[in-house]
A protein has these predicted regions:
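Bacterial N-terminal signal peptides that target proteins for export
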Residues: 1-9
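Short alpha-helical segments used as structural interaction elements across diverse proteins
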Residues: 1, 173, 239-241
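Short, charged juxtamembrane terminal tails flanking transmembrane helices
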Residues: 243-246
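A ubiquitous, low-specificity "background" feature that marks scattered single residues
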Residues: 8-9, 212, 230
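Zinc-dependent metalloendopeptidases
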Residues: 19-223
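A short, hydrophobic C-terminal helix/tail in secreted or cell-surface proteins
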Residues: 223-241
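Bacterial N-terminal signal peptides
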Residues: 9-18
Length: 246
């Protein structure tokens, strides 16, 4: 979900009642996608990894970014890449990693459209991560993903209840926001606001929503869960099986 930011940034993450449990929900920004503003058209989206010390005082409450290298386990990058690949396999989106220039959060930058880093979000039991909707949404904040540095992160996706959260699953959820999807009330959907390891990656409703925004993938087939190297906005603590996502 979107963290509570400056008023110029669109907020995300709260379930809006009543929501029907039958369809994806597109985010509130306009045009609400990358590339052409026309729904159903593809896009190339860049992404970059923010360095420790990057200023994010423009976020509600203020913060300083910690690089993923400094709080995630070795091998995390593969899970980030797999999360991007899970979306490009089902929708007409191409992702390209670029260098991050170190500019402050929401400032003018030549970094990726989606910038990824972490900061303290209050510790275990609260928000796991948050992701910002696409343009127009503040300055360069649109699309950015931030993880909670105080939670435990895992390369595995084994449902062991060890208190750690799947980097792949949470990243895929947050990328969904960064590309234009809101939370959905549809059960067993990646964009449902509760963390679960009952399934892997985008599900039918998530895929339908992303294809509505960007069109179907030009090449390739839907990935099988076994083909993904298994390892948001926020998850609210209800145990490992159910925690609210942003």
């Amino acid at each position: 979900m979107k963290s509570r930011l400056l008023s110029c940034l669109a907020l995300v993450g709260a379930l809006v009642a009543p929501l029907t449990a039958s369809a994806f929900v597109v985010g509130p920004t306009t045009p609400g996608k990358w590339g052409s503003p026309v729904m159903g058209t593809g896009a190339t989206v860049t992404w970059s990894l923010m360095a420790t010390g990057t200023d994010c005082s423009d976020e509600f409450g203020g913060c300083t970014i910690t690089a993923l290298d400094d709080f995630m386990p070795v091998g995390y990058l593969t899970q980030i890449q797999n999360a991007f690949a899970a979306w490009s396999a089902v929708a007409n989106i191409t992702f390209v990693q670029v260098a991050d220039d170190g500019a402050a959060f929401n400032a003018a930058t030549t970094s990726g459209d989606i910038r990824i880093g972490g900061h303290n979000m209050g510790g275990p039991g609260g928000t796991l991560a948050h992701g910002f909707f696409p343009p127009a949404n503040g300055g360069s904040a649109a699309g950015d993903l931030h993880f909670d540095t105080q939670d435990l992160w895992d390369l595995d996706f084994d449902g062991t209840g060890d208190g750690a959260f799947s980097i792949f699953q949470v990243t895929a959820h947050e990328i969904g926001h960064a590309l234009g999807l809101e939370h959905t009330a549809v059960p067993n959907s990646l964009m449902n606001p509760f963390y679960t390891e009952a399934f892997v990656g985008p599900q039918a409703d998530d895929i339908a929503g992303m294809q509505f925004i960007y069109g179907k993938a030009v090449v390739g087939e839907l990935p099988e869960p076994s083909a993904l190297a298994l390892v948001g906005l926020a998850f609210v603590g209800m145990g490992l099986s159910k925690r609210r996502k942003s």
